[in-house]
């Protein structure tokens, strides 16, 4: 056949073959090296377009450019080279003409030769200094592979190998012009004549070196190793290998030769097999001339001193030859690396055993997948294997499965493996062959499909010949083939790694395949363990084989296959063969281990020479650890892999690819694929036994690795393995799932868990505890939802176990049991029902993990099986109900054992539970929201409903399962609601107590644990959305979820502070409920407590809880949490239930508790924000209480008028400094729990008046807002409030975090929902109006005073306003979460006025809101917890919130207030504007003293922080803000004007003025937002002022506060 080769002929006549792949041209490390100084190190790239069969050159941005026909080509752009084009690189004196030559290559040569080797020989035309080319660069890797094969086939096949090599040489010679440089050792590589000569000499050399195939093979192996060497796995990633700078021609040239892939494939085996020696000597010589020293690479003496040496050593071990110096390996490994880089397909080509470099790649997974199924990439290794097997059957039948598997791996490797040198794909039976092929195969990557087959054929032929030499039957031949494959060093690297993965597949599939795979997989790093485990595994396998005597025919075949790779001597009996192989493997492993310690790494060097035992041990180790698989595994989620294991180890092992890629689906098929050509049953049986022993071993090993005894799962697995042998497929699948593959995946999963903690770990842990029965129950409950990810569910079922390493360990041992249990229950469950049952458990696991199809989830899933496994194991024979019961007990135990770990998870479980009860529709929202905690990406496959399961703790899962099985949904729901209420109360209390601190610590994002995604949104927005959009029932569920989330965030704090009390309280309540409900409650309690971390719900004492919880029935608690929260937000009238509560607990503490509970209930609905949680965690209950008290007193002045019904706590701010700190915009914005502080305050006030309910709805966080708002209005019984109110309040709650617009809508709803509330509100409004009138009078006074003090008030406005007011506004602004709402009186005022105006919001809320926003600048520090504060602050911050936040005041009151306030407001605006102008002028005048100005301003701002009296009237607040701003500005100006420029004097003046203001009862905003607003340019201030005056709202403050708030939120 004619082969076309392209050459670059230099002006000196040197001919450079252009490989059909990318090569680099440059001075260093390039395939075509030019010595001209005008040529860059990497000057240009010549790439081959296989579609168009043309070469293209691209200048790599070189300094001197690349010229085609004396025209410089643009940089970084491919230019097509045409025939006879004149190419010059830089100003090199040599120009190159593109020539095309066609060579006649015998068909035989093409068959037996890999793509022609590319040899670049450049003879410097002008001067050596300009061009110093390595004389020759020939990659005879394919020929070498052929030679290796021949060498392996020495003896009976020596002649045939020689002939093949000769053919290869011919081919190489012929191909030289056609693109292939002659194989190494060929005499003439450059021209057609050289190629022809090469064909002759190659043949003669082949004949010559047929005698010394070792040298040739070693040399080629080294070359191949260099090419496919794992040293530069990264390089392998690259399209080209720069490392092989030694080679002028990239190894991939071989891969791209015109010759058919067959030739390439054969060359690959040649490389791996030492049978190719005939070509090797010339190659050696060629290498002598090349930088790569191939002279030492003679068959018996691999002299390649490159990295290949190590792989070659492996080859030698396989072939019984010792590789030459490692030095040779390096050169060739460079070649191999270069080839791999140049040929991505080569990179993928590395056989599974060759995945040394892909330890973290997907190769292992793919290898497993390749075993018996299609690859995820879509390749079908089995189908490929059959093709290879057919040609190879000529050599030996035993080789067929091996080669088939090899090819399976090969496509997988080619597709997935980025390793350059694993061209040959070793079958699970003969991974070594694959490795040897892998090198050349990488070269021949373009014809991946054909090449693998050809290579497999060649390998099998060689292997068969070699086996015959060894005088063994087909099995023996398989072993030699494997050895030959393993000969190549570089492939071995990838193969060893890939082997591990492949071995995992193989372990399930025929033992023969498994053993080689194992050796490769485990050889390197795990060689010793691999040996030990291999021996054990072999023995176990032998026993299994005996047990599987019923399938002796197939088993003997696999056994023989295994035996042959293990030792050349064939062992007839499988049992004997297996032990022998293990011994041999151990020896081989030892040898390879020595070699394995090469730079490539232990795994890298290990190859086909290792004994079966070693391979098996490695495979088992890999399975147990999932070390190799995880990397590749990462692509193919461990979940996918895992489910396969669960479904059937056989599937996983036998059809590794399908297992990996479609673990669930391939459940029924694995047995057949396992056989790869063997009978399905025998293979299944065999894999089953193998799997059983392997599983056992794996489980044992996993338990050791994870510090958990896997004995129980192991023995169950074994017993089930043995016991289920009769049920071959199902049993084996189960066994595989349970014992070997399962532990393997779990191990990997565990390893992955640390990697995936954010997404998978938490979900996994939660899933983990759900028992199999729980899974089944969940399945029944959630099966419809889980239908989406049935397969994934299967995977996740096991994966769930993997969440924490500890759980994963336990789960692993239990996992095997679980799988066994499941199989005992129904083997069909795994196959048919697995998708049904497991999808449910997976609903939790997959949904939680969102793993669905992703295989990573298997890691999590494994954890789920952990606990489930143990339960299932014990109840393997039990019905699902029994299992459920057992699981319940197990859960109960777990609750005790894992309570700490499970706490957050338990909460989620409860949430999930409620969600489930409420319906799957709700589940998605809640789950998704919980997912924010888990940060589980809503996996494509996982529905939002599933997400909560992911986040749900295993115990919670169990509880959920128990609930469904025991119908605890009602009781549990009540308990959960009760718990939530208690937690909400605790949170509210803590919130209020630590609200200020939390505001200060706004940055605290502990809510991350709850929802990494949602800082403020998830708690408030989600709950509001759900409440607003969903029915109350769903709202309640969402509330539960929110509460759970909150509690989960605060749970850590609760645990720290009151965990025991919270849990005890929950437990006590739950005790009344059935045990299952109790269990769930416990888990929830734990979870909530834990999740409540910073929330502060723990702040509530048991007494408080008891006092508050009893007041609200459990059912009432949940619904009332939402409803109360909403109603509190919505209206100020007392709900009857709330009134009753207040009445029953009139004591300040009792009331506080109740209000806290009520608010906390609403609060718990939106889980605590990170900020609030963090603050609570820092400050604790006392801090929150203190804040609440201080805030209360601070707020009360404003609240006294604002909260007319409330006692109007002391008007003077108790802790302005603390409030200021809390009001800091960053902290405030960051912690949306700030409202909780103000809410706490209002709850405290609510003691006096039970009106805390409505305030909550105004605050960003309803609970928080309520806490502050209740003071304004007597707390109406939460029960009294209508669900619509609750919803609207929830809506308001969300809007408070989002916007006041939501509030307005919620206000409207509230208004509609209850006119009684409106009436009450009207009364309150009237009271507030009166209070506002008083405040207005005070403001007028203040205005006058301020006008007098304008001169003394100074520019400190900027700093002070920005720091304090804008902070509080930022805290309040758009994220009116509890933390965001300032604790300052202004917030209270706004909330109060807002609450009053809410019913009327439709009419005038906008104006009021606008006023409030301006005022809110001053009151941003006010805790957002109070509804009034929220409205005030938010209105100041967000005019959109204003409509909803504006109190539903009587129109008359509003008008009256406006009339009263407008003049004052205008006056204050005028003063403020004038002051602003004056300040600016003063700044200009004192520009030189700008520094002093800033300092003085800062000092004054810090010293002049006087909280403005909290006023329900937002306009009043804005006026006060403006006046205070003016005051500060004047103070700054005075300080500046003062020649001394003494800020202290100014500060004293300021203090005096503030004292006057205080004496005048001027509410001063502790917030610096007003000052900050003032700090803005006067123009802005004026604009805002005018706007606010027109709208009777202080937009400037609001806008500034909004900005600040947004900034801080970010």
Curated annotation (Swiss-Prot):
Q: Where is the FHA domain?
A: 23-73
Q: Which Pfam families match?
A: CEP170_C (PF15308), FHA (PF00498)
User: According to the UniProt entry, which residue ranges have a biased composition of type Low complexity?
Assistant: 1193-1210, 1287-1307, 1363-1380, 1549-1561, 1588-1600
Broad class of the protein's primary localization: cytoplasm
* Family annotation (PROSITE patterns): FHA_DOMAIN
Instruction: Give the protein family.
Output: Belongs to the CEP170 family.
Query: Native species of this protein?
Result: Xenopus laevis (African clawed frog)
Key word Secreted present = no
**What's this protein's function?**
Plays a role in microtubule organization.
Question: Which domain of life does this protein belong to?
Answer: Eukaryota
Localization per Swiss-Prot or TrEMBL = Cytoplasm, Cytoskeleton
Give the compositionally biased regions (Basic and acidic residues): 164-173, 196-221, 452-469, 497-506, 776-788, 834-845, 1062-1073
Protein name in the entry: Centrosomal protein of 170 kDa protein B
**Which residue ranges have biased composition labelled Polar residues?**
437-448, 470-495, 712-722, 1017-1040, 1048-1061, 1116-1128, 1146-1167, 1381-1390, 1562-1578
GO CC, one annotated term: cytoplasm
Keyword Cytoplasm on entry: yes
According to the record, the residues making up region (Disordered) are: 148-237, 304-523, 648-730, 737-756, 774-853, 931-951, 1001-1240, 1253-1321, 1361-1404, 1419-1445, 1540-1610
What keywords are annotated for this sequence in UniProt?
A: Cytoplasm, Cytoskeleton, Microtubule
Q: Which InterPro entries match?
A: Cent_Immune-Sig_Mod, CEP170_C, FHA_dom, SMAD_FHA_dom_sf
């Amino acid at each position: 056949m004619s082969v076309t080769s392209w050459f670059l002929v230099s002006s000196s006549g040197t001919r450079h073959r252009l490989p059909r792949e990318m090569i680099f041209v440059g001075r260093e490390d390039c395939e075509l090296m030019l010595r001209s100084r005008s040529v860059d190190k990497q000057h240009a790239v010549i790439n081959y377009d296989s579609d168009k069969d043309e070469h293209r050159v691209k200048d790599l941005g070189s300094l001197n450019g690349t010229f085609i026909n004396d025209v410089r080509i643009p940089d970084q752009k491919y230019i097509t080279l045409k025939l006879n084009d004149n190419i010059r690189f830089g100003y090199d004196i040599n120009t190159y003409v593109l020539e095309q030559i066609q060579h006649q290559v015998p068909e035989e040569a093409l068959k037996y030769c890999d793509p022609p080797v590319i040899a670049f020989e450049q003879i410097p035309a002008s001067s050596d200094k300009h061009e110093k080319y390595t004389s020759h660069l020939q990659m005879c890797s394919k020929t070498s592979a052929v030679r290796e094969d021949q060498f392996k086939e020495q003896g009976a096949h020596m002649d045939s190998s020689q002939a093949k090599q000769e053919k290869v040489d011919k081919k190489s010679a012929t191909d030289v012009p056609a693109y292939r440089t002659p194989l190494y050792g060929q005499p003439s590589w450059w021209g057609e004549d050289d190629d022809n000569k090469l064909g002759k000499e190659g043949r003669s050399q082949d004949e010559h070196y047929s005698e010394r195939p070792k040298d040739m093979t070693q040399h080629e192996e080294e070359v191949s190793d260099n090419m496919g060497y794992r040293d530069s796995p990264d390089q392998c990633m690259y399209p080209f290998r720069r490392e092989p700078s030694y080679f002028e021609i990239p190894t991939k040239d071989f891969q791209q030769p015109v010759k058919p892939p067959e030739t390439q494939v054969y060359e690959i085996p040649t490389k791996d097999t030492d049978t190719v020696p005939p070509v090797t000597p010339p190659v050696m010589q060629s290498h002598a001339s090349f930088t790569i020293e191939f002279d030492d690479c003679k068959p018996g003496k691999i002299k390649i001193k490159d990295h290949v040496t190590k792989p070659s050593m492996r080859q030698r071990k396989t072939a019984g030859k010792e590789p030459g110096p490692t030095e040779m390996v390096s050169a060739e490994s460079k070649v191999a690396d270069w080839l791999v880089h140049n040929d991505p397909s080569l990179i993928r080509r590395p056989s599974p055993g060759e995945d040394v470099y892909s330890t973290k790649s997907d190769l292992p997974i793919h290898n497993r997948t390749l075993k018996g199924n299609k690859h995820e990439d879509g390749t079908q290794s089995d189908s490929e294997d059959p093709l290879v097997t057919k040609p190879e059957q000529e050599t030996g039948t035993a080789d067929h499965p091996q080669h088939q598997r090899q090819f399976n791996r090969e496509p997988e490797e080619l597709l997935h493996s980025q390793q350059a040198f694993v061209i040959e794909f070793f079958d699970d039976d003969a991974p070594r062959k694959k490795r040897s092929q892998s090198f050349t195969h990488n070269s021949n990557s373009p014809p991946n499909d054909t090449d693998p087959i050809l290579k497999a054929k060649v390998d099998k032929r060689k292997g068969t010949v070699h086996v015959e030499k060894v005088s063994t039957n087909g099995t023996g031949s398989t072993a030699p083939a494997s050895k030959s494959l393993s000969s190549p060093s570089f492939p071995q690297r990838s193969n060893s790694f890939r082997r591990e993965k492949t071995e995992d597949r193989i372990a399930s599939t025929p033992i023969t395949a498994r053993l080689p795979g194992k050796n490769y997989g485990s050889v390197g790093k795990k060689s010793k363990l691999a040996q030990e485990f291999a021996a054990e595994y072999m023995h176990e396998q032998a026993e299994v084989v005996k047990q599987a005597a019923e399938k002796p025919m197939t088993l003997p075949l696999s056994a023989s296959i295994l035996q042959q790779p293990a030792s050349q001597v064939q062992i007839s009996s499988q049992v004997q063969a297996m032990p022998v192989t293990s011994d041999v493997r151990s020896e081989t492993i030892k040898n390879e281990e020595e070699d394995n310690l090469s730079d490539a790494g232990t795994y890298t060097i290990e190859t086909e020479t290792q004994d079966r035992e070693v391979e098996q041990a490695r495979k088992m180790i890999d399975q147990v650890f999932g070390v190799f698989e995880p990397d590749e595994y990462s692509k193919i989620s461990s979940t996918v892999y895992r489910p396969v294991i669960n479904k059937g180890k056989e599937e996983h092992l036998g059809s590794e690819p399908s297992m990996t890629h479609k673990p669930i689906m391939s459940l029924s098929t694995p047995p057949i694929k396992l056989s790869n050509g063997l009978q399905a049953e025998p293979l299944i049986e065999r894999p089953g036994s193998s799997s059983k022993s392997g599983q056992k071993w794996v489980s044992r090993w996993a338990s050791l690795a994870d510090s958990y005894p896997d004995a129980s799962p192991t023995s169950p697995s074994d017993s089930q393995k043995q016991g289920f042998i009769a049920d071959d497929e199902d049993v084996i699948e189960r066994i595989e799932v349970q014992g070997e593959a399962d532990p393997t995946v779990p191990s990997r999963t565990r390893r992955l868990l640390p990697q995936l903690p954010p997404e998978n770990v938490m979900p996994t842990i939660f899933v983990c505890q759900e028992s199999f029965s729980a899974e089944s129950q969940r399945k029944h409950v959630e099966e419809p939802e889980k239908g989406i990810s049935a397969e994934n569910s299967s995977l996740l079922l096991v994966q769930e176990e993997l969440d924490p390493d500890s759980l994963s360990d336990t789960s692993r041992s239990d996992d095997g049991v679980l799988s066994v249990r499941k199989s005992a229950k129904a083997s069909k469950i795994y196959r048919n029902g697995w998708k049904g049952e497991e999808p449910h458990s997976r609903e939790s696991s997959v949904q939680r993990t969102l793993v669905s199809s992703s295989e990573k989830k298997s890691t999590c899933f494994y954890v789920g099986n952990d606990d489930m496994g143990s339960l299932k194991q014990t109840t393997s024979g039990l019905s699902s109900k029994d299992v459920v019961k057992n699981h319940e007990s197990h859960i109960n135990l777990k609750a005790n054992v894992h309570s700490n770990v499970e706490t957050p998870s338990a909460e989620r479980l409860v949430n999930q539970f409620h969600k489930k009860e409420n319906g799957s529709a709700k589940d998605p929202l809640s789950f998704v929201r919980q997912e924010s905690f888990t940060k589980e990406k809503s996996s494509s496959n996982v529905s939002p409903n599933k997400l909560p399961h992911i986040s749900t703790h295993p115990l919670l899962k169990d509880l959920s399962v128990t609930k469904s099985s025991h119908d605890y949904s009602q009781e549990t729901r009540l308990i959960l609601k009760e718990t939530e209420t208690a937690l909400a109360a605790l949170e509210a209390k803590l919130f209020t107590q630590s609200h200020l601190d939390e505001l200060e610590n706004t940055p605290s994002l502990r809510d991350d644990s709850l929802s990494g995604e949602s800082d403020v949104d998830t708690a408030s927005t989600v709950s509001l959305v759900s409440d607003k959009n969903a029915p109350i029932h769903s709202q309640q569920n969402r509330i539960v979820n929110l509460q759970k989330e909150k509690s989960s965030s605060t749970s850590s704090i609760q645990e720290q502070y009151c965990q025991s009390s919270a849990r005890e309280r929950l437990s006590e309540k739950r005790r009344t409920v059935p045990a299952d409900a109790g269990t769930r409650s416990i888990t929830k309690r734990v979870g909530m407590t834990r999740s409540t971390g910073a929330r502060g719900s723990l702040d509530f004492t048991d007494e408080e809880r008891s006092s508050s919880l009893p007041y609200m029935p459990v059912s009432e608690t949940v619904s009332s949490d939402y409803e109360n929260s909403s109603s509190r937000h919505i209206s100020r009238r007392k709900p009857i239930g709330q009134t009753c509560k207040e009445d029953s607990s009139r004591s300040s503490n009792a009331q506080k508790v109740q209000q806290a509970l009520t608010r906390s209930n609403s609060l718990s609905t939106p889980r605590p924000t990170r900020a609030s949680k963090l603050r609570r965690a820092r400050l604790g209950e006392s801090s929150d209480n203190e804040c609440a008290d201080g805030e209360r007193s601070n707020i009360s002045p404003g609240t006294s008028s604002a909260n007319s019904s409330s006692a109007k706590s002391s008007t003077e701010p108790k802790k302005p400094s603390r409030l200021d700190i809390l009001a800091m915009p960053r902290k405030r914005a960051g912690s949306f729990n700030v409202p909780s502080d103000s809410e706490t305050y209002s709850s405290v006030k609510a003691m006096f008046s039970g009106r805390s309910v409505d305030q909550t709805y105004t605050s960003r966080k309803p609970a928080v807002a309520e806490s502050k708002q209740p003071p304004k209005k007597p707390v109406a019984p939460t029960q009294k409030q209508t669900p619509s109110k609750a919803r609207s309040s929830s809506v308001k709650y969300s809007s408070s975090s989002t916007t006041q617009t939501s509030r307005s809508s919620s206000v409207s709803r509230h208004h509609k929902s209850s006119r009684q509330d409106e009436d009450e509100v009207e009364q309150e409004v009237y009271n507030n109006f009166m209070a506002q009138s008083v405040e207005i009078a005070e403001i007028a006074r203040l205005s006058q005073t301020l006008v007098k003090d304008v001169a003394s008030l100074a520019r400190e406005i900027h700093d002070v306003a920005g720091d304090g007011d804008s902070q509080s506004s930022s805290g309040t602004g758009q994220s009116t979460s509890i933390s965001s709402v300032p604790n300052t009186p202004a917030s209270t005022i706004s909330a109060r006025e807002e609450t009053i105006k809410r019913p009327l919001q439709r009419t005038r809320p906008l104006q009021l809101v606008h006023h409030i926003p301006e005022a809110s600048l001053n009151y941003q520090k006010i805790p957002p917890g109070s509804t009034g504060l929220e409205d005030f602050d938010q209105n100041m911050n967000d005019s959109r919130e204003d409509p909803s936040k504006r109190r539903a005041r009587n129109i008359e009151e509003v008008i009256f207030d406006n009339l009263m306030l407008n003049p004052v407001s205008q006056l204050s605006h005028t003063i403020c504007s004038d002051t602003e102008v004056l300040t600016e002028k003063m700044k200009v005048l004192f520009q030189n003293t700008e520094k002093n100005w800033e300092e003085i301003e800062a000092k004054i701002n810090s010293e002049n922080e006087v909280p403005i009296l909290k006023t329900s009237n937002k306009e009043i607040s804005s006026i006060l803000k403006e006046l205070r701003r003016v005051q500060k500005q004047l103070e700054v100006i005075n300080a500046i004007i003062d020649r001394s420029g003494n800020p202290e004097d100014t500060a004293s003046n300021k203090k005096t003025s503030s004292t006057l203001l205080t004496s005048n009862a001027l509410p001063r905003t502790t917030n610096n937002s007003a000052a900050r607003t003032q700090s803005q340019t006067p123009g802005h201030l004026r604009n805002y002022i005018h706007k606010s005056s027109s709208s009777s709202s202080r937009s400037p403050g609001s806008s500034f506060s909004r900005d600040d708030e947004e900034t801080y939120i970010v």
